[in-house]
Amino acid sequence: MDLLPPKPKYNPLRNESLSSLEEGASGSTPPEELPSPSASSLGPILPPLPGDDSPTTLCSFFPRMSNLKLANPAGGRLGPKGEPGKAAEDGEGSAGAALRDSGLLPLLQDMNKLSGGGGRRTRVEGGQLGGEEWTRHGSFVNKPTRGWLHPNDKVMGPGVSYLVRYMGCVEVLQSMRALDFNTRTQVTREAISLVCEAVPGAKGATRRRKPCSRPLSSILGRSNLKFAGMPITLTVSTSSLNLMAADCKQIIANHHMQSISFASGGDPDTAEYVAYVAKDPVNQRACHILECPEGLAQDVISTIGQAFELRFKQYLRNPPKLVTPHDRMAGFDGSAWDEEEEEPPDHQYYNDFPGKEPPLGGVVDMRLREGAARPTLPSAQMSSHLGATLPIGQHAAGDHEVRKQMLPPPPCPGRELFDDPSYVNIQNLDKARQAGGGAGPPNPSLNGSAPRDLFDMKPFEDALRVPPPPQSMSMAEQLQGEPWFHGKLSRREAEALLQLNGDFLVRESTTTPGQYVLTGLQSGQPKHLLLVDPEGVVRTKDHRFESVSHLISYHMDNHLPIISAGSELCLQQPVDRKV
């Protein structure tokens, strides 16, 4: 009787695999073949199969990065079992460093935690990503198995539009970056449940919702159901998520990509919903909820993921010198228009957006701290990806020693100065005026006793030696003949004159000569819009006007709203001044 030779044990170093006969006899399955560490492999990263039909989040389109460690920049990539493997190539190292410096690292951490354990795992150390997971020309987003749904040119250009229903938004009181991944997901899904209960006819409203836990109740605030249930056109592009009413073409919101911190789908009971957290001047930080037709929610999430990937590749091609974390920033559209906001307790940026605080050496600091030390402000350009408004050092023209100590700013004409807001160190402006022979009245803001407009253009004119606009006198004389011009008026006095939606008036700034403010009432909320840019030009985001009267008549006669910072102001009834 012949004895069968013993079956050889499977060696992972063998070139051939076990035959089907050997597999059946052994009763065990060979381990899965490990991916090649070659950096040239650009094959798509397959998502976990069990999660294909389940609701997902935007984060599930990104690689697993929970083991990312930044403590050892020189660390190499580890193999699947921890053995040192082939070091990442230079291109990967630079991409990983750019990822770390860009401020996107907190957004990409804890990705794919909702998916199962069947997908590939990649260990990342030293800020370097594995070759198959990342290359500069590759993809950092786990594409769907069928690939992206739309051509890149379309997402980078006009965008992709979906017809959905806007269900409202819920205020988020904490930064999403301060929360872990599971809590972020719970926040968005709890916001979806709150809106479903509040809006009649919403999908998933019939199910019983568990009481909101105490931690979530402290994170979520009030709901805003102003446009709840309205059919809208959602346009997804690399620049923004645009929400426009389908019938009247009114823009409900326009959230720049850098202001979006998290996006997620619903749970199995609310699978047709998409929620994302964004910041805007109207709702501050809020979770916006969209109801999609059946089967469309996954496509919307996938398109948002594609837009994020393309946006990050744009950032890699044009990285800024300095980057600020995206969740602290709200979008800035580069418009010369901006809303005049009431001065808050802690001073804010020249272009006023919630959550921004001026750095040391700004206009406000130097006014309030007479004789304070002069800090050095770095020179930087605005980020094309994160939209971060960064200070650019500007100096008084007569202070030669300060210019030698500080970095020279990039050449910036007057128009770019307004689009790229700058800080001016005005500590020695009074000395410069006295050296020039002009005494000038003392600044009322030095002791904080006199109120002032937050958008005070005077320091910019002094530091840049810009003469007053030559047409300011003629403009003032022309406005005196307009019944809706009230001269110098404070914010509260102007708001007291507004009674109905559509009421408006024009007033002169109490602290900035030559600056005029349009005050109007829209949806019960007063709006204050600046009309003159630093060059003395009356303009909106899209048009220039000969005068303030021309701007008012143009929008009244054509029944066109003025759009600023994502909100509208309609000019319907002028408020005449009292004679």
Swiss-Prot record:
Question: Segment CH1: which positions?
Answer: 340-483
- Asked if the record carries the keyword Cytoplasm, the reply is yes
Q: Which GO terms describe its cellular component?
A: cytosol; focal adhesion; mitochondrial matrix; plasma membrane
Residue ranges occupied by any PID domain in the UniProt entry: 156-339
On modification after translation, the UniProt record reads: Phosphorylated in response to FLT4 signaling. Tyrosine phosphorylated by ligand-activated PDGFRB. May be tyrosine phosphorylated by activated PTK2/FAK1. Tyrosine phosphorylated by TEK/TIE2. Tyrosine phosphorylated by activated PTK2B/PYK2. Dephosphorylation by PTPN2 may regulate interaction with GRB2. Phosphorylated by activated epidermal growth factor receptor. Phosphorylated in response to KIT signaling. Isoform p47Shc and isoform p52Shc are phosphorylated on tyrosine residues of the Pro-rich domain.
Residue numbers of Phosphotyrosine PTMs: Y349, Y350, Y423
Keyword set includes ATP-binding: no
Question: Keywords on this record?
Answer: Acetylation, Angiogenesis, Cell junction, Cytoplasm, Growth regulation, Mitochondrion, Phosphoprotein, SH2 domain
Here the disulfide bonds are none
What is the annotated role of this protein in its UniProt record? Answer: Signaling adapter that couples activated growth factor receptors to signaling pathways. Participates in signaling downstream of the angiopoietin receptor TEK/TIE2, and plays a role in the regulation of endothelial cell migration and sprouting angiogenesis. Participates in a signaling cascade initiated by activated KIT and KITLG/SCF. Isoform p47Shc and isoform p52Shc, once phosphorylated, couple activated receptor kinases to Ras via the recruitment of the GRB2/SOS complex and are implicated in the cytoplasmic propagation of mitogenic signals.
Q: Any idea what this protein is called?
A: SHC-transforming protein 1
Name the gene behind this protein.
Shc1
